[in-house]
Structure formats: C-alpha cells, structure tokens
Amino acid sequence: MRQHCQSITFADNEYDTLSEPLKIMNFAMKLHYQLLAAQAENTDTLPILLIHGLFGNLDNLGVLARDLNQQHSVIKVDLRNHGLSPRSDEMSYAAMAQDLLTLLDDLQIARAIVIGHSMGGKAAMALTALAPDRIARLVVIDIAPVAYPSRHHDDIFAALTAVSDAGLTQRQQAAQLMRDYLDEEGVIQFLLKSFHQGEWRFNLPVLFANYAAIIGWREVPAWPHPTLFIRGGLSEYVQNSYRDAIARQFPQARAYEVAGTGHWVHAEKPQAVLRAIHRFLGQP
C-alpha cells in the first residue's frame, strides 16, 4: 500500500497575490462544542481543534479525537448551520473563521493545533488569515485552498431534499429513499448520522443557497508555518495541479497521501491518517 509523506516541491516560490487579510466581523456565533481534557497527566502539549466538513457534526472526527486526546486536550466543534450550533443565512469562510476565533477566545486558548476535513479544512485555512498567530500547526484533510469548478453534491442535496419533502421520520425509511439518488451506502450512512426525529441537523436550505461559496475560495495571505495536507489516493479534491496554489498560501506545506482511500480518508484508514498526524506533530 502506498502511504507516504513527502515535501511539496515547487519550481518557483516567487509570486504575486491579490489576497487581503480577512477582516474581523461582528457576525460571530457561539458554536456548540465538546472539550476533552488530555488523558495524560502533566502534559504541556497544545490543544487541538477538530473541524468537520459539509453535512457533518462534531462527532465525525471522533476516531481522531479519541487517539489525539491521549496527549492533547481536544475541542470538537459543530460549525454554524451544523449539528447543535446556531443557524444563520451567512455561510462564508470569513464567518466560519470568526466563529472559530471567538471559540478560542471564549476558551482562553492562545494557540492551538487546528485539524479540519473538507469544508472544515477550508474554514481552518481561512482562520490563518484572520488570526495567523493563534495557530501553531495546521492539518488539512482532503481539500485544497482553491475554488472548485464543479458541483459535487447535487445528488446529495436532491436526496436530502427528498427525505425532507416526504416527511419521513425513520432512518430506515430515509435510507431507502436516498438510495434512489445515491449509490454509495457509506455516504448515505454518513448523512443519516445527522437525521434525528425527522429533521436534518444541518441547515439544508442555507447550505444549498450558499453552495457556490462553499466550493469557492478567496486566496489567503501566505501563512509561513508548518502545514500538512493529507489526501486520499482515490480522491479528486487535492490534485497535483493545485500545488502552486498551495505553495502561495502555505509555503511550508507538506503532503501525505493514503492509497486506496477517497474523500473520507480519515474514516477509511484512520490509523494511516493518525500516523501522519503524529509524525507531523513531532517534527521541528
């Protein structure tokens, strides 16, 4: 199995950027979170902030949290319009980053290690522009700091909407209907984790209305600190053609690929992902 860690090599690190620092806004929301104290005694390690992706919640990175919690305090968070966090018509990465910064402030966390998957990875990268000195190290799982040209979730939106329109209340009924729209059983079961008493625990209309912003991206200023990009070998979200964009914004980036995995690489091969994270956190 091909699982390796490598430096991202770039031909030219001279570039111009039109990006500007994100401005601190006043639309921050108080996010729902869970704080897990480090299991090890007398540890002086930095806390880790875990950020889920689109349609997810704070439990989605639980397999990572349980391992990392042995040596680190871990904060699991529901992003706005997800889980038990507040709802809003605003769903920009600037807003998500401000929410995360407010959470760090409320918890009196001066610096943290930030790990985000998919949309959560983009929110984490946006946080580097808003509060560059508050992040010690950054891990981005299967997403790149680019605007994606294609819509990848229209079938998912159709399935979710069909369940809502049908007024279903049981997960088994919802799963049966969703199979008319989706072929991947793993995706269906992932989505159903957010289905409770006939309601989706994410703001489906707002996510649909803001989907262009979610797959879009405004480049952030170069963040010259250790960054790890983990990609699934079968995923199309982090392509070699994105290396220049990564280099401009994260000049200390390293790459780690886990063969035989798709977009949910951390769920498919969690031990490989954890090995990469531990190795990265142990590097100078």
Regions found by a protein language model. Name each.
Residues 253-284:
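Catalytic active-site module of serine/aspartate enzymes centered on a nucleophile-bearing elbow/loop
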Residues 125-130, 136-168:
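Flexible "cap/lid" loop of the alpha/beta hydrolase fold
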Residues 53-56, 118:
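Active-site glycine-rich loops that stabilize anionic/oxyanionic intermediates
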Residues 36-40, 62-69, 75-115, 119, ...:
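Active-site loop/oxyanion-hole signature of alpha/beta-hydrolase fold enzymes
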Residues 51-53, 231:
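The conserved beta1-alpha1 loop
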Residues 2-49, 69-72, 109-111, 250-254, ...:
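Alpha/beta-hydrolase fold catalytic core
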Residues 198-249, 257:
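Conserved serine/cysteine hydrolase catalytic core
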